[in-house]
C-alpha cells in the first residue's frame, strides 16, 4: 500500500529480547510457511486463523490484527516453544481473542512433514487462556 501509514498499538517487539532459537533435530518440524488455525479451549468463545513462518528455531507470524515472534525446538515428531503476541492494528469492532494485550505464549505439540498440532497457554493480563492449534505446511523453505 503506497503512502499508507501504519501505527503500532504497542511498542514494537524487538527480536533481541526473545529467547534464542531452539535446536532442530531429526524428525523435527520443517522450515516453511504454515497456515495456523487456533481454537480457544475451556468453553470460551474465540479463535483465529493466520500464517506462521518457521525457520531454524525462529517463529514469525500473524493475522489481520496481531503479529508474533518467538522461538521453538523440535525433534522426533515433537516441538515446543514460546512466543510474544502483540496487536499491530486496532481490533475495534472486532472480538479479538487476545483483546489488545501483549501476550506471552508457551506451547508444545506434535509434528510431521506436513504440519503440526499444538496446545498452549496464553497469559493475557491477569487471565490465562488455553488453546489448541493446527498448522499445515503451505510452502517449504
Task: Describe each PLM feature range.
Residues 2-44, 118:
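Tryptophan-anchored aromatic micro-motifs
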Residues 2-3, 64-115:
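Contiguous, well-ordered beta-strand patches that form the walls/edges
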Residues 29-33, 51-60, 74-78, 109-116, ...:
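Short, solvent-exposed coil/turn segments at beta-strand boundaries
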Residues 35-44, 57-65, 96-102:
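Short, solvent-exposed secondary-structure boundary motifs
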Residues 42-44, 89-91, 128, 141:
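Residue-level signal for secondary-structure boundary sites
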Residues 44-86, 120-121, 125-127:
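N-terminal glycine/threonine-rich, aromatic-flanked beta-hairpin/loop signature
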Residues 49-51, 69, 104-108, 130-134:
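Well-ordered beta-strand positions in beta-sheet-rich domains
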Residues 112-136:
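Short, compact, well-ordered microdomains
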Amino acid at each position: 500500500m503506497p503512502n499508507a501509514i501504519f501505527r503500532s498499538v504497542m511498542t514494537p517487539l524487538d527480536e533481541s529480547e526473545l529467547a534464542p532459537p531452539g535446536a532442530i533435530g531429526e524428525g523435527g518440524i520443517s522450515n516453511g510457511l504454515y497456515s495456523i488455525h487456533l481454537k480457544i479451549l475451556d468453553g470460551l468463545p474465540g479463535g483465529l486463523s493466520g500464517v506462521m513462518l518457521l525457520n531454524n528455531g525462529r517463529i514469525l507470524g500473524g493475522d489481520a490484527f496481531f503479529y508474533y515472534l518467538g522461538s521453538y525446538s523440535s525433534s522426533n515428531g515433537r516441538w515446543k516453544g514460546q512466543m510474544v503476541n502483540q496487536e499491530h492494528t486496532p481490533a475495534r469492532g472486532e472480538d479479538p481473542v487476545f483483546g489488545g494485550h501483549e501476550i506471552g505464549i508457551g506451547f508444545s505439540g506434535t509434528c510431521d512433514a506436513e504440519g503440526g498440532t499444538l496446545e498452549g497457554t496464553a497469559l493475557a493480563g491477569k487471565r490465562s487462556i488455553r488453546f489448541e492449534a493446527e498448522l499445515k505446511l503451505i510452502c517449504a523453505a
